[in-house]
Curated annotation (Swiss-Prot):
Transmembrane segments: none annotated. This is Chaperone protein DnaK. Keywords: ATP-binding, Chaperone, Nucleotide-binding, Phosphoprotein, Stress response. The keyword Chaperone applies. The modification Phosphothreonine is found at T197. Induction: By stress conditions e.g. heat shock.
Amino acid sequence: MAGEIAIGIDLGTTNSCVAIKDKVIENAEGARTTPSVVAFTSDGQTLVGAPAQRQAVTNAKNTIVASKRLIGRRFKDNVIKGIQKDYPYKIVEAKNGDAWIEAGGKSYSPSQVGANVLIKLKEAAETYTGKKVTKAVITVPAYFDDAQRTATKDAGRIAGLEVLRIINEPTAAALAYGLDKTATTKNIAVFDLGGGTFDVSILELGDGVFEVKATNGDTHLGGEDFDRMILNFLVEEFKKENGMDLKNDPLALQRLKEAAEKAKKELSSTQETDINLPYITADAAGPKHLNVKFTRAKLESLVSDLIDRTIEPCKKALKDSGLKREEINEVVLVGGMTRMPAVVKKVTEFFGKEPHKGVNPDEVVAIGAAIQANILAGGSDAQDIVLLDVTPLSLGIETLGGVFTKLIDRNTTIPTKRSQTFSTAEDNQSAVTIRVFQGERQMASDNKLLGQFSLGGIPPAPRGMPQIEVTFDIDANGIVHVSAKDKGTGKEQTVKIQASGGLTEEEIKKMVDEAASKADEDKKRRELVEAKNSAESLIHSTEKSLSEYGSKISSSDKQSIDDAISDLKSVLAKDDASLIKEKTDALSKVSMKLGEAMYKESQSASNDSSPKNDSTEEGERVVDPEYEEVKDEDSK
């Protein structure tokens, strides 16, 4: 494994980024970040990033944005109900009860959609290195639960990546920020407000150790919510002026969403902007236009409640870390939303100090992930760093009366392992069912059900006699594993949590195969496009040359070229790259006669315009020059 290339990926709600070591890699469009947008077109293409974003207005129902908000979630989750009305694409219930996406007549898991983004980033890294890339560290919001982390890891597998580690976004940011700052011990707070999620982590840095003391957050708070507040305001303004509700028009909504995001960004550096959308809709009287003057003050009033929501998690994280505000040495801002002046002001007020502004909030997470990837891959230049992260949520089981009994508390350093001994409730009971939950509420039903499993084959015995030791293990990815051992017989059983949702191994394998097949299709499609472009370019240049120099070649050569052009034109519509290349080569070959004629013509023109050295004009007197040889005195 030593010396292998491993990349770091920040798979974001709005934008994603890939890095190697400490360098951010540009994508195929030359941009350092890639929009987390995937579109399925009517002709079977899958577009990712900026190309998908550009066609969103005309293909809104098949253009998937913010799929990270769905990853690892159940369809009946209250969050999903809120999301459905915000996006034009359709969210459907999968067979296992998870929230999936319907587009182009097919259903896709959020992991599949995320995998498309990962593939694009992986390809960018392969183009940059000139080598195949198969290993990665992928970041997730610190407050992601087990199902969301597992689904993110599945996305990596579908994309053909071995996910070396899932790490928390604030931890990755701290790694990038503090790599050269561990000579002295310091406490830092990472405030991460991105496109769809919010996290805050308190860390202690020193002597090459990055130790997370506490983390908190909100997996449903981010830039998308800010955009929605602006969009709703614009809809209401238009309704007041025109009496029409734009929420029933998907095309208008997509244009409004893009305008809202653009205005939000502009108001980070200006006090006022114009939102101008001509022909936003029409009625019997004709087309309607939207033109609104939008100020920073108005924006801040619309989103003040959202900004305030970031403070409670900050308070909880500080409390759990055992530190006071004045003990925080540095505050690091991460995520595009931290460019908003009102957000910076709120953070400054809470922590009592100006945030550190020496990192790029859009890139720092990917860089941190890449640093960790280089360490895990055994890079020769990898620094000796110890990363101690925590589990964001408590892990436990449902006990008598539906009570949630915690086995592992939140903010416990991971990896970690805890064991608990269970027994039977009835005589001769041969099996017990254990339901595993993650969360902080007192009652199990109010927390997130990770799954349940049954321990069978228990020997007949009076109730309370069998001693079944169940071990709960959270790995370095924050993903939960369970094992069990019958202490009476010494027999050990491997128990796999049967999650209530999530992708099965068979589904993942199928999706991996589909992704590989899609990659082959995309390659063939690209080859076809390139072949057609070359053919059309050759036809154009040959026809142009033929019109200018056709008289300089024989009629039979001219006929051969005309025939070759006709042959090539006839196969352009057949979508057969090899046939198009064959006919292109044939035209290129027969048109060589035309090239020879063009060369002779240019040579003739060149000779006609050059000075005539071998003849003189009539009456011109030629005088031989007189000269004297000067000998070099030094050469004797």
